[in-house]
């Protein structure tokens, strides 16, 4: 095999990156072998803390390798492995075949197929991922002047899927906060009929909700009148920290009546105790 950076026609910095990646792969292989030996020899199996620590080390190694591969993708795609005339092909044939292999090994191929099956079962189309990755890499030379710095970074084919999942999650959370959080009955209870739900209460939950809404409206009017009596206050000052905190936690600004507004509580005159009867 051709040795050194001269045979590969690499710059010193490029050869250094290649050496760093080789060392990272060596560390990853060592960590995998160490974990495999620990599991094989330990009776009983290693503790949960030990397995978690090993998994964290492996994940960190994989992230580092992925980052190096992304940062030097052009370099690694340009490098071509070719045997030199003095390579011991007879005694090191297995290494030569491993380096020159263009297809995945059967075991690795089975892992890839399993991953594709899991992705398909989850609603992800592997062919769509591959096509999106191909489209992201197919840039014309004229497009380079119009690309942002973020577009120059290596693209992830799962970005669109993660964005879709994030949007669905946010929509579900928003629907729950706005429509379901204050709902006294579940969807299943609504479907079977709320008259068949045993709440253990003498009054209907629907009636209680309507009464609470009326009380909230009355209290809001009282608060607005109390606030108006304190001077000329614009509409922006009618929002208190309690409203903001409630909006952040529940998705609406309907503060319950049992929550006192600190600003109004401080401004209102405390009610004194009645004088004792003579």
From Swiss-Prot:
Species lineage: Eukaryota, Fungi, Dikarya, Ascomycota, Pezizomycotina
Gene, per the UniProt record: med-8
Compositional bias ranges of the Acidic residues kind: 139-154, 206-222
Function: Component of the Mediator complex, a coactivator involved in the regulated transcription of nearly all RNA polymerase II-dependent genes. Mediator functions as a bridge to convey information from gene-specific regulatory proteins to the basal RNA polymerase II transcription machinery. Mediator is recruited to promoters by direct interactions with regulatory proteins and serves as a scaffold for the assembly of a functional preinitiation complex with RNA polymerase II and the general transcription factors.
GO biological process: regulation of transcription by RNA polymerase II
Stretch list, region Disordered: 122-161, 201-224, 257-278
Name of the protein in its database record: Mediator of RNA polymerase II transcription subunit 8
SS bond list: none
Keywords: Activator, Nucleus, Transcription, Transcription regulation
One cellular component (GO) term of this entry: core mediator complex
Record-level Gene Ontology MF annotations: RNA polymerase II cis-regulatory region sequence-specific DNA binding; transcription coregulator activity
Subunit structure and binding partners: Component of the Mediator complex.
Principal location listed in the UniProt entry: nucleus
Pfam families noted in UniProt: Med8
Family membership: Belongs to the Mediator complex subunit 8 family.
Subcellular location: Nucleus
């Amino acid at each position: 095999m051709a040795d050194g950076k001269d045979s590969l026609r690499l710059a010193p910095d490029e050869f250094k990156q290649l050496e760093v990646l080789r060392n990272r792969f060596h560390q990853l292989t060592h960590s995998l072998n160490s974990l495999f030996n620990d599991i094989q020899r330990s009776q009983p199996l290693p503790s949960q803390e030990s397995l978690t620590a090993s998994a964290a080390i492996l994940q960190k190694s994989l992230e580092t390798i992925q980052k190096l591969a992304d940062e030097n993708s052009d370099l690694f795609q340009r490098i071509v492995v070719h045997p030199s005339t003095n390579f011991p092909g007879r005694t090191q044939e297995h290494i030569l075949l491993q380096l020159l292999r263009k297809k995945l090994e059967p075991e690795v191929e089975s892992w890839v197929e399993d991953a594709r099956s899991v992705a398909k079962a989850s609603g992800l189309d592997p062919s769509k991922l591959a096509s999106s990755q191909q489209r992201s890499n197919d840039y014309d030379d004229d497009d380079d002047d119009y690309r942002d710095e973020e577009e120059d970074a290596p693209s992830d084919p799962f970005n669109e899927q993660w964005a879709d999942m994030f949007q669905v999650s946010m929509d579900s959370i928003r629907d729950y906060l706005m429509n379901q959080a204050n709902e006294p009955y579940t969807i299943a209870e609504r479907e079977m009929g709320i008259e068949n739900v045993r709440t253990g209460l003498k009054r209907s939950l629907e009636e209680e909700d309507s009464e609470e809404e009326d009380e909230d409206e009355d209290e809001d009017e009282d608060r607005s009148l109390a606030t108006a009596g304190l001077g000329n206050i614009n509409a922006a000052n009618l929002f208190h920290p309690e409203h903001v905190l409630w909006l952040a936690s529940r998705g609406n600004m309907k503060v319950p009546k049992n929550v006192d507004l600190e600003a109004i509580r401080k401004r209102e005159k405390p009610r004194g105790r009645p004088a004792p009867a003579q």
